[in-house]
Regions:
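The feature marks proteins involved in alpha-glucan
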Residues: 1-6, 26-98, 105-108, 119, ...
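C-terminal beta-strand-rich structural cap/linker in extracellular carbohydrate-active enzymes
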Residues: 11, 43-45, 558-578
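Short proline/glycine-enriched turn/loop motifs at strand-loop junctions of beta-rich domains
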Residues: 10-17, 44, 537-538, 545-547
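Conserved alpha/beta catalytic core and glycan-binding cleft of carbohydrate-active enzymes
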Residues: 69-70, 262-266, 270-454
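Short, well-ordered beta-strand segments enriched in hydrophobic/aromatic residues
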Residues: 9, 529-535
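Glycan-recognition and catalytic regions of carbohydrate-active enzymes
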Residues: 344-360, 417-418, 423-432, 457-529
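Substrate-binding/active-site clefts of carbohydrate-active enzymes
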Residues: 87-91, 100-271, 277, 289
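Core domains of carbohydrate- and sulfate-ester-processing enzymes
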Residues: 51-85, 172, 191-206, 324-354, ...
Length: 578
């Protein structure tokens, strides 16, 4: 593992590189492969690089940027990472909880977030998924415009705060998954191209030139990304990574970058004696993403992948929305397919995309199971990319959220909650960022135009306004209010059932079945547990399933051959108690 006190940088085309401390530059020594290095610096030292007499630049591998991506880098004391490993867990199938450090609390810091970890334990969460903490411009933002892939955002608490947060999670039995964005760099503070061929025009992405994974110089670029992953997993002792939008990795090399990462992570597991988990966000609906390396052509070896079709099926069914990418969703039959087959688009035509899409999941292959697919009812994308960042509870009865939650939390998949979902938080999660005076207004104007084209007539919150970020900060004082407390208790009961009942802990896709009772109501059967969920409004729905009602949302009672519940709502029934 590299010496983090010794400045070193890859600048293959440079004639001279200096390390600059307190305004004084010292010429660095050149080694093979275009690398430059200097003698170690004391912890706390602020330094920058200067290439061929040009501008001062931050260290691309800096662990700390106290003044943001435009400022100097800081040497972090290696002793920060000298601590024993106390936690290890396979996070496939674990109940995850996605949170954004900047809005999980009003303070927006790791330290403040730690004060609410016991709430997550009581809820039944087993792992927190932290939205990106890699350094990005400004004080607050979602983090997907990060530019310091090794540095922890200073406003959150920097590397010291992150280590303390991870240790606090582990002390409570919570795993930590970190969201990393390696498919692009943000537009502000991105100095990588001044050091070497980190980008290539051979491929194009929504953000411009692609990260260079397969052109000249790509070996060092791949090592740069792998090194960041190793830092989080080995040095910081994060337990898993969520890899953002892997479908945007443009890599035509014989060995795909993700396959290389998978192999490296397996080696790090052997080195550390800890289980490490890779989750990939992908919209390609390809089971090869989670197929073991070498098992089938194109296998990438990820441990899990996001399955957005399940979200779309739940959201569209319970809200009635059918616009945009929801156009192929919304019916009970589609919901049935999503909860049993994972993908709605499994090789057939996607109306939204205008082409055939995806491939079927084959449970009989033995290459993966339900725990290989991460599902959610809400997440940062599906809430935050709405015009005003509204949650499902803001536009539908609470019973609809409760019924949808019962289906996905008790499904054979890996469930992921979004912060505040468990009590139907009143706060929205709109998009916000804190870019400079040149880029900030462009983002604001572009976002307004985007939603105008989509037909939204609501006033779009200004992403650059501090008030937009403040509106997203969770209100922890509302948790005890009646409706919020009722939803929280519902989520706690569902997660208790998932933990305590073997039928529900299993990831077997072969042992889940769905039945459509009517256009508003479905049954999900898993062993001796049946989940009834209905979106019916203010009417009694008969559920022809006998047994003991374990938990219920909505007024219910016995009827011949089963039970009846007033919708929207849900019953979870133990059929072995018949």
């Amino acid at each position: 593992m590299r010496d983090i006190t010794r400045p070193e940088v890859w600048a293959p085309d440079a004639d001279m590189v200096e390390v600059v401390v307190d305004g004084t530059g010292t010429i660095m020594a050149r080694s093979d492969g275009g690398w430059w290095w200097s003698e170690p610096l004391p912890p706390g030292t602020l330094y920058q690089f200067r290439i061929d007499g040009g501008m001062l630049l931050p260290d691309p591998r800096s662990l700390s940027q106290p003044d943001g991506p435009h400022g100097p880098s800081r040497i972090v004391d290696p002793a920060l990472f000298d601590r024993p490993a106390t936690f290890s867990a396979d996070l496939r199938g674990a109940v995850g909880y996605e949170l954004h450090i900047g809005t999980f609390t009003p303070e927006g810091t790791f330290e403040a977030a730690t004060t609410h970890l016991d709430h997550l334990v009581d809820l039944g969460v087993q792992a927190v998924e932290v939205m990106p903490v890699a350094d990005f411009p400004g004080e607050q933002g979602w983090g997907y415009d990060g530019v310091g892939q090794y540095a922890v955002h200073a406003a959150y608490g920097g590397p010291e705060g992150f280590v303390a947060f991870i240790d606090a999670c582990h002390a409570r039995g919570l795993g930590v998954i970190l969201d990393v964005v390696h498919n692009h760099q943000g537009p502000e503070g991105n100095y990588l191209a001044q050091f070497g061929p980190y980008f290539t025009s051979a491929h194009h992405t929504p953000w411009g030139d692609a990260i260079n994974l397969d052109q000249p110089g790509s070996n060092e670029v791949r090592d740069f990304l792998l090194g960041a992953c190793r830092q989080w997993l080995v040095k910081y002792q994060v337990d898993g990574l969520r890899l953002d939008a892997v479908h945007e990795f443009q890599d035509d090399s014989p060995r795909h970058y993700l396959a290389e990462l998978s192999d490296e992570v397996r080696a790090w597991e052997r080195e550390t004696g800890r289980e490490l988990t890779l989750f990939a966000e992908s919209d390609r609906n390809q089971p090869t993403t989670v197929s073991p390396i070498g098992s089938v052509p194109g296998a990438l070896g990820m441990d899990g992948q996001w399955a957005d079709d399940v979200h779309h099926a739940l959201h569209s069914f319970f809200t009635g929305e059918r616009d945009g990418y929801y156009i192929d969703f919304g019916t009970a039959d589609v919901l049935k397919q999503a909860l049993t087959k994972v993908f709605i688009h499994e090789g057939g035509f996607s109306t939204f995309r205008g082409q055939d899409w995806g491939a079927p999941v084959d449970p009989a292959s033995g290459l993966y199971d339900g725990h290989s697919f991460v599902v959610s009812l809400q997440n940062h994308d599906q809430v935050g990319n709405r015009a005003v960042g509204d949650r499902i509870s803001h536009s539908t009865p609470l019973g609809c959220q409760a019924a949808a939650a019962a289906l996905y939390l008790l499904s054979p998949f890996t469930p992921l909650l979004f912060m505040g979902e468990e009590w139907a938080a009143s706060t929205p999660f709109p998009f916000f960022s804190h870019l400079g005076p040149e880029l900030g207004p462009l983002v604001t104007e572009g976002r307004a135009r985007e939603f105008e084209r989509m037909g939204w007539d609501a006033e779009i919150p200004d992403p650059q306004s501090p008030a937009t970020r403040e509106s997203a900060a969770l209100r922890w004082d509302e948790v005890t209010e009646p409706d919020h407390a009722r939803m929280l208790a519902w989520y706690q009961e569902l997660l208790r059932l998932r933990r305590d009942r073997p039928d529900l802990a299993s990831g077997s896709l072969a042992e889940v079945s769905m039945e459509v009772l009517d256009e508003d109501t479905v049954l999900m059967r898993r062993g001796t547990t049946t989940v009834a969920a209905t979106r019916a409004r203010d009417r009694l729905v008969e559920i022809p399933v006998e047994g003991e009602v374990l938990v219920a949302w909505g007024e219910y009672g016995p009827v011949p051959g089963g039970h009846a519940v007033t919708g929207p709502g849900s019953l979870v029934i133990d059929t072995k108690a018949d």
